Amino acid sequence: MAQVGVQLIENGEAQDFTVDLGRVPVAGDLIELQGTYFKVASVTFGIDSAHEALIPRVVAEQFG
């Protein structure tokens, strides 16, 4: 599993999560979270201070 920081933008509101995905998504991918599909807008990498590790950070917008 890949631990990924995700910022979901739904109805103009942003929510931040850390989730385990099967792989690191790339821009344009669709991911399903909480029964809703989101389109990945961008992927960056940042330090997760709690785990002292480099993790991907995804910005995704509600799809459809």
What are these regions (language model features)?
Residues 19, 24-25:
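Short, well-ordered loop/turn sites that connect or cap secondary structure elements
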